[in-house]
A protein has these predicted regions:
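A post-motif C-terminal structural segment
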Residues: 1-206
Length: 207
């Protein structure tokens, strides 16, 4: 597992009169501070970083290096936060995610299912624009003046909340042909199970 939140976890443990390093040593599972502390040849690691602004591609590459050593295969879930009331940061994260998906799709083997989707859509909309001005002209001032995260500039609007339209699901690898059209999100679970060669239990009858 790789993620952020070390300061918050450390503070919460301190309130409970506990120490993160002591707890991790007692459990026999060190909580590492950065990627460089992952030992060569490791097959698993727990890395808790100080900040959420880490290199996503490095995190995925290091994780794939560990998990792909398992001859029985692996499951890796990558979550990336693009729901933010900081518009420029959110757009930058979308670009990062797009590049990471493309690179990871080239790295994994043909026997690996790569599945991409979102848990919800987000109310960030391009609503026009004119030739000449930059797309995000006026953004910083609009964010400073925005009530409760509502941003309005010439080319863009953002209401900091979820929206109700369908989200994209895309895939490559074994079972990718089953991903398309309108699907229930629970059907993606069955696609993943089938890629393992397992059969999911039938759904419970609706009452």
């Amino acid at each position: 597992m790789i993620g952020a939140g070390r300061p918050a976890v450390t503070a919460a443990l301190k309130e409970a009169s506990l120490d993160l390093d002591a707890v991790s040593q007692k459990g026999g599972r060190p909580v590492l501070k950065n990627f460089s502390e992952i030992p060569d040849g490791a097959t698993r690691a727990l890395v808790m970083l100080d900040s959420g602004e880490f290199d996503l591609q490095t995190a995925i590459d290091r994780t794939l290096r560990m998990l792909s050593a398992n001859p029985r295969g692996y499951f890796l879930m990558v979550e990336w936060d693009t729901h933010t009331d900081r518009v420029r940061l959110g757009l930058d994260r979308l670009v990062t995610l797009d590049r990471v998906i493309a690179r990871t799709a080239q790295k994994v083997g043909s026997d690996t299912l790569l599945l991409f989707t979102a848990d919800h859509s987000f109310d960030l909309r391009l609503r026009g624009g004119t030739f000449g001005p930059q797309l995000l002209d006026g953004l910083e001032q609009a964010e400073a003046d925005a009530p409760k995260g509502q941003v309005r500039i010439t080319s863009l609007r953002m209401d900091n909340g979820h929206t109700g339209e369908e989200v994209l699901a895309a895939a490559q690898g074994p079972g990718a042909e089953r991903v398309g059209g309108f699907m229930a999100n629970t059907d993606l679970f069955r696609v993943m199970m089938a890629a393992y060669g397992w059969e999911a239990s039938p759904p419970s009858p609706t009452r």
